Design a protein with these regions (language model features):
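Short alpha-helical "patches" and their helix-cap loops
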Residues: 2-4, 68-76, 176-180
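Conserved ATP-binding subdomain of kinase catalytic cores across diverse folds
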Residues: 1-32, 58-65, 84, 96
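General structural signal for secondary-structure boundaries
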Residues: 29-31, 44, 134-137
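Residue-level detector of functional hotspots within protein domains
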Residues: 5, 41, 47, 53, ...
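Conserved kinase catalytic-core segment
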Residues: 36-93
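C-terminal catalytic region of ATP-dependent kinase domains
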Residues: 78-180
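Short amphipathic alpha-helical segments and their helix-coil junctions
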Residues: 31-40, 144
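A generic structural signal for short, non-catalytic loop/turn and secondary-structure boundary residues
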Residues: 12-14, 74, 156
């Protein structure tokens, strides 16, 4: 799910663990779930007609690969995405380079699932959210990458450029889902 953490709840949650206002994508910890591949399952359950729309956006924006969906068996089969280690170009490799980002920045990468049954309002909302993502939003997320991770500031800067540049085109492709 893609959401914005509001400023009203930012701050220290536990000693040494803080949350900041920003866009986030996350899955909750599910105690009773199963995994489905590759198609998004159970569109008619829970709020999946809305949730699936954000997953189409995530997949296209970050050039997803190896679709893995968790179904919450205790919550009307709500669907979540997980394991994004093979996202970003070159897809399926588990790493990216500036050259790969630059050469794929304008590449459409739609989720290959049938889009029938998505909630029209969610399509519009998701496209609007993508168009509303600012450089500051992206920076706030990328600045949370722990220094111990094997990625340089230059690589994160390149990823930020790529995200910013792709967002409007992905928004346009998400809007096109309404006619499918």
């Amino acid at each position: 799910m893609v959401m914005r953490v509001p400023a009203e709840i930012q701050g220290e949650l536990l000693k040494g663990v803080a949350i900041t206002s920003s866009f986030v994508h996350a899955s909750v910890a599910l105690d009773n779930c199963d995994e489905k591949r590759p198609q998004l399952p159970d569109r008619g359950h829970d709020d999946n007609r809305r949730r699936h729309t954000t997953l189409y956006a995530l997949y296209d924006w970050f050039m997803g690969w190896d679709q893995q969906w968790l179904r919450d068996l205790d919550d009307d089969l709500a669907v979540y995405s997980h394991d994004h280690g093979l996202y970003l170009p070159p897809v399926g490799s588990g790493y990216w380079t500036d050259g790969d980002l630059q050469s794929n920045v304008d590449t459409a990468w739609p989720l290959p699932d049938d889009a029938a049954g998505l909630l029209p309002a969610a399509i519009s909302e998701t496209a609007d959210e993508l168009r509303g993502v600012t450089r500051a939003d992206i920076q706030s997320v990328l600045m949370q990458v722990p220094p111990s991770w094997p990625v340089t500031d230059e690589q994160l800067e390149g990823l930020g450029w790529w995200m910013e540049r792709r967002a409007p085109a992905v928004a346009g492709r998400i809007e096109q889902l309404a006619s499918s």
